[in-house]
Design a protein with these regions (language model features):
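A glycine/serine/threonine-rich, flexible loop-to-helix segment
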Residues: 3, 179, 191-221
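Conserved glycine-rich cofactor-binding loop
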Residues: 16-20
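The beta1-alpha1 cofactor-binding region of Rossmann-like NAD(H)/NADP(H)-dependent oxidoreductases
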Residues: 63-75, 107
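Active-site helix of classical SDR
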Residues: 125, 162, 170
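Alpha-helical segment proximal to the catalytic Tyr-Lys
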Residues: 130, 175-179
């Protein structure tokens, strides 16, 4: 679909890049010639992904980082900048979620999700954006949303609220930073039957199940 090395010279950070959708995006970016960085909570998981993508010829590094902590985010971004210069792209993919009646959600449970999705996405976008503005870099941010921000997300209110915040951050900063040449976009790709996501959102359902196909009018996936 794309020319080989179409992303050569690009430097892209994918948060939550050790597993699932983040891993697949990181692998694709690397296959197209980008220098890729991934971050997540567990260095061991990141190392496995780094080794796998490197074996396939990709250029990638992984950093364990708690994106809920702004100081940790800034330290990681400084490290990446020193490693080879400014990033040209950021993918806000890291997220967390669980199924629960909202009446049972505790403040700690709410913060477990909102601190990753809402705060973490802002910390990363701000850390990259301020550096891009200072250095005159025309960077790009892609944030991953969910359809809950339009349709509502019963039993996933902390995530739905947080993703709605990321959506309005994207629109607001696109308007505010556009004149710097910084682009911000967001996509809601829908559910991917990865092990981690399905265990949290559809407990007991096989990732190979056709149950979700039945929700699609044309039965296509």
């Amino acid at each position: 679909m794309f020319q080989k090395d179409v992303l050569k010279g690009k430097r892209i950070l994918v948060t939550g890049g050790g597993t699932g959708l983040g891993k697949e995006m990181a692998a694709e970016y690397a296959s197209l010639g980008a220098s890729v960085y991934i971050c997540g909570r567990r260095q061991s998981v990141l190392d496995e992904t780094v080794n796998e993508i490197t074996e396939n010829g990709g250029e990638i590094k992984g950093y364990a980082c708690d994106i809920r902590v702004s100081e940790a985010v800034n330290d990681m971004i400084d490290t990446i900048w020193k490693d080879g210069g400014a990033l040209t792209g950021l993918v806000n993919n890291a997220a967390g979620n669980f199924i629960s009646p909202t009446k049972d959600v505790t403040p700690r449970g709410f913060e477990a999700i909102s601190n990753i999705v809402f705060r973490g996405s802002f910390y990363l976008t701000h850390a990259c954006g301020t550096r891009w503005i200072d250095e005159g870099v025309k960077g790009s941010v892609i944030s991953i949303l969910t359809t809950w921000i339009w349709n509502g997300g019963p039993f996933t209110v902390p995530s739905a609220m947080s993703k709605a915040g990321v959506n309005i951050m994207t629109k607001s900063l696109a308007a505010e930073w556009g004149h710097y040449g910084i682009r911000l976009n967001a996509i809601a790709p829908g559910p991917f039957p990865t092990k981690g996501a399905w265990e949290r959102l559809s407990p007991g359902q096989d990732t190979d199940s056709n149950e979700n196909d039945a929700k699609i009018p044309m039965r296509r996936n």
